[in-house]
From Swiss-Prot:
The keyword Lyase applies. This is 3-isopropylmalate dehydratase large subunit. The gene is leuC. CDD domains: IPMI. It comes from the Bacteria. It comes from Anaeromyxobacter dehalogenans (strain 2CP-C).
Length: 480
């Protein structure tokens, strides 16, 4: 456990945000009570929590600090001629109607199906300007760490905790340890934040960040856009971390300015002044540190059944026989058996059946633009779904003609939603199929029973779409 700094010691941004939100300090026998600034909810993990509130006759403590959307189980196909949404089953439709009722009954602001602001929760929240530096942010979703890109302390919570926050606006939490990931150099052509985070997870392993909050530092991180920073923080959980964040700077402030929930006028100036004090103090110490050189990286892709099993697209499928640790060797053997891959064989050239471009990891406008760079003037050789992360992303992309590029390439341009990332809405792959996906998890069956997922960036996914196989996006863009 990181120790609380006294007033004279340099503090990390993690310490600063944590200390500012402690309602009751933790003890050896009890976790801290932490105040929550923003609670995001969606239709899958909130129904049970609202039911408990009803049963106990409770109201929301701070309804204005709760914001709702729909994303997990909603269709990404448009309404039918009868005006109805094509839900995959009755359960999905019931989740949506129950969400509408819950938000109406408890006074929660909801941006649901058909709303121009609706989107995947971790795309929608920042677009609304609801996510701001120095906040504590929670959501009943694993990838809430996305909001850490704004210098917020953001983490996923379980359904029972969703109920706790709705009723009290507080949460029981143990103070996390701190991990600094410093990234020197600069990402080369054809690389993005997705390649960087896959490389970091490959180095740390899926349990390397357990019990920690990661702060991403260094020139390569500072050079990222806000979209890139959100991608980076989004997958912190895949290294086992509780959360991940990037300290706010002018890039952050410029992105937030003018958004619906961002402060306005004099309040904006006051907020920016506060936010500028958030970055870690010079001399602040961390429990652990990791250093990488971005200029040494190549486009990444996963080959196995967890996000830590990643290699360069130019690399070879690892051989379990070279693994000294017996447990790690067994894990690798099982992964390759499920994936049907041969040790020592190049990953490039592996046949692909489906490509998915979207999700809370890579469903933003920058991701749509990157995919379009590869798709423009080419034809896809495999089924390809491009799913914007929100209606705002969709609208902006269509204004730029990206939808036309996607359709002319033979790919599908869909409505916003989680879609094939979690495959709850009918967007899935069949057993044995290979899918290059810009999402965040490649667990067995994640995209459909027996489906095989390879995680990659939008550029690498689009390169797979137009070649029908795993390919180096740099070579595709160069016309080779």
């Amino acid at each position: 456990m990181s120790k609380r700094s006294d007033g004279n010691q340099p503090r990390t941004i993690i310490d600063k945000v944590w200390d500012a939100h402690v309602v009751r300090a933790e003890t050896p026998d009890a976790p801290a009570i932490l105040y929550v600034d923003l609670h995001l909810v969606h239709e899958v993990t909130s129904p049970q929590a609202f039911t408990v509130l009803r049963e106990r006759g409770l109201k929301l403590r701070r309804p204005e600090r709760t914001l709702a959307t729909m994303d997990h189980s909603i269709p990404t196909l448009p309404r039918g001629a009868d005006g109805r949404w094509p839900f995959v089953d009755a359960q999905a439709a019931a989740q949506v109607s129950q969400m509408e009722r819950n938000c109406a009954d408890f006074g929660v602001e909801l941006h649901g199906l058909g709303d121009e602001a609706q989107g995947v929760v971790h795309v929608f929240g920042p677009e609304m300007g609801a996510t701001q530096p120095g906040m504590t942010v929670v959501c009943g979703d694993s990838h809430t760490a996305t909001h850490g890109a704004f210098g917020a302390l953001a983490f996923g919570i379980g359904t029972s905790e969703v109920g706790h926050v709705l009723a009290s606006q507080c949460l029981l939490q143990r103070r996390p340890r701190t991990l600094a990931v410093r990234v020197d150099g600069a990402l080369g052509p054809g690389l993005s934040a997705k390649d960087l985070i896959l490389a970091i997870i490959a180095r740390l392993g899926v349990g390397g960040g357990t019990g920690h909050v990661i702060e991403y530092l260094g020139p390569a991180v500072r050079a990222l856009s806000m979209e890139g920073r959100m991608t980076l923080c989004n997958m912190s959980i895949e290294a086992g971390a509780r959360a991940g964040l990037v300290a706010p700077d002018d890039t952050t402030f410029q992105w937030l300015a003018g958004r619906p929930r961002a402060p306005k006028g004099a309040a904006w100036d006051e907020a920016v002044a506060r936010w500028r004090a958030l970055p870690s103090d010079e001399g602040a110490t961390y429990d652990r540190e990791l250093r990488l050189d971005a200029s040494a990286l190549e486009p990444m892709i996963t080959f196995g059944t967890n996000p830590g099993q990643g290699i360069a697209v130019t690399g070879l499928v690892p051989d379990p026989a070279a693994e000294r640790d017996a447990s790690a060797r067994t894990t690798l053997e099982a992964a390759l058996r499920y994936m049907g891959l041969v040790p020592g064989k190049p990953i490039a050239g592996q046949k692909v059946d489906v490509v998915f471009i979207g999700s809370c990891t890579n469903g933003r406008i920058e991701d749509m633009r990157e995919a379009a760079r590869v798709l423009k003037g080419r034809k896809v050789r495999t089924r390809t779904l491009v799913v914007p992360g929100s209606h705002r992303v969709k609208k902006d992309a269509e204004a730029e003609g990206i939808d036309r590029v996607v359709r002319e390439a033979g790919a599908e341009w869909r409505e916003p939603g989680c879609s094939m990332c979690i495959a709850m809405n009918g967007d899935d792959i069949r057993a044995g199929q290979y899918c290059v996906s810009t999402s965040n998890r490649n667990f067995e069956g994640r995209q459909g029973p027996g489906g095989r997922t390879l995680l990659a960036s939008p550029l690498t996914a689009a390169a797979a779409a137009v070649t029908g196989a795993v390919a180096d996006p740099r070579r595709v863009l160069e016309g080779r």
